[in-house]
Amino acid sequence: MTWARRNRQNNNWYYIQQRERAMIYKQVICKDGFRMSVQAGENLSSIPRQNSVERYEAVEIGYPSEKESLILEYAEGPNDPTDTVYAYVPVHIVTLVIAKHGGMVSGEVPPGVIVLPA
């Protein structure tokens, strides 16, 4: 959002850009107990790297509760798969992970990830 403000001393206008806040999505919990954080936004490993977009193509997964073979290739620290971030994971892969674990019981995902309820 951009808006203008007038400087009182010299009567000139200047523009202030207010950044949209990043949404923090609640941890995804699947039917079989599998858990993971799924986030997207300006300072995260997502496509696009912007806040509040209509649809993301790739998102960041963090700290899954167990090793998950579908996302291993995206791991930043593959030696400890439950204590790392998974960068630029395509949204269709996230949907497959949720489906593999029986669907989503609770949590939130960024726009673009298809929610499959348990």
List each model region and its residues.
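Short, Lys/Arg-enriched N-terminal segments with co-localized hydrophobic residues
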Residues: W3-A22
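Short secondary-structure subsegments characteristic of cysteine-rich extracellular domains
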Residues: Q50-L72
